Amino acid sequence: MNHATSELHDESAVTSVPETTRIQDLKALVKMGIVNSNTLTVFTGFWLALHFNGLSVMDNLDKLFFTIVGSGLVMAGVCCLNNYIDRDIDPLMERTKTRPTVTGKYKPGFALTFGLVILLLGFVFLLLTTPMAVLMGFIGAFTYVVLYSLWTKRKYTLNTVVGSISGAVPPLIGWAAIDPSLGHPIAWMLFLIMFIWQIPHFLALAMKRVDEYRNAGIPMLPVVHGFEITKRQIMIWTVCLLPLPFYMSGLGITFMVIATLLNIGWIVLGFYGFRKKDDIKWSVQMFVYSLNYLTILFVSMIVVTFF
């Protein structure tokens, strides 16, 4: 890993620090975009657990509050810790060089302390639901901070797969807050969807940002093995999503049709990449599709329960 970044760090901190408010800096520190997107999956897990256990959301508003706040704090905490860990390589990447731990808006010690405090506070909130929700939160946090950020991210191309484990945990946190047995198969389908989805999503991003990852010394798959192998891996993982809706028949035929159409659309776009000459443009299209895919899919899971 290239650690000779002090000059670049100093230069970015002195000459190119963007004008931001304290609130904007705090949002960047906790990666609010990631927190918000994962909150949807937490809520979906919570909602579906209510639905399949015949429970009312109005009777569980307290648990909903503790679940959303607790999981949000856990995710914000691990994102803070990730910013702290990556402060030496973030200046080398265009999309991360303005993070407050790079620009000096927040000192490393603050990021570390603040991250640990809100992480622990998140566990306290989750404990007000069920111990299993805390365990799921801990597994997600440990995987992201230790197994991904500290271990595999800078050493192995499998970093994307390892990181996807932590990103697949949020719906299980939501489900466990209502049903700590996690015995319903749909709970684990949510986990599998999130796990598999993240791999083509982040590999597409890695293709788009391949030069930045190369400069930072991060062994993402397209950096180490090139675009052709990366495109094959993207296709393999995308195809793996195809059968999952059929294990979620409890959500009805409408959801199964929506999910299958989304999967087919992603697969078709994926195959198109083998005929397209502009790999970067294709990777952007795949990345954007993946974002819309996840939002539509998880919102659909909630909507179909009303009919």
Swiss-Prot record:
Where mainly found? Answer: membrane
Question: What UniProt keywords are attached to this protein's entry?
Answer: Cell membrane, Heme biosynthesis, Membrane, Transferase, Transmembrane, Transmembrane helix
Q: Which Pfam families match?
A: UbiA (PF01040)
- What GO terms are given for molecular function? protoheme IX farnesyltransferase activity
Q: Where in the cell is it found?
A: Cell membrane
Q: What is its EC number?
A: 2.5.1.141
Q: What class of enzyme is it?
A: transferase
Family matches, as CDD domains: PT_UbiA_Cox10
Q: Which GO terms describe its biological process?
A: heme O biosynthetic process
Q: Does the keyword Transmembrane helix apply?
A: yes
Reactions catalysed according to its record: heme b + (2E,6E)-farnesyl diphosphate + H2O = Fe(II)-heme o + diphosphate
Gene Ontology cellular component list: plasma membrane
Hey, which pathway is this one from?
Answer: Porphyrin-containing compound metabolism; heme O biosynthesis; heme O from protoheme: step 1/1
- List the transmembrane segments: 32-52, 65-85, 108-128, 131-151, 158-178, 186-206, 251-271, 287-307
Q: How does it sit in the membrane?
A: Multi-pass membrane protein
For this chain, the family text in UniProt reads: Belongs to the UbiA prenyltransferase family. Protoheme IX farnesyltransferase subfamily.
* Self-association state and partner proteins as the record states: Interacts with CtaA.
PANTHER family (alphabetical): PROTOHEME IX FARNESYLTRANSFERASE, MITOCHONDRIAL (PTHR43448:SF2)
Write out the function statement from the record: Converts heme B (protoheme IX) to heme O by substitution of the vinyl group on carbon 2 of heme B porphyrin ring with a hydroxyethyl farnesyl side group.
Further remark: Carbon 2 of the heme B porphyrin ring is defined according to the Fischer nomenclature.
What protein name does the entry list? Protoheme IX farnesyltransferase
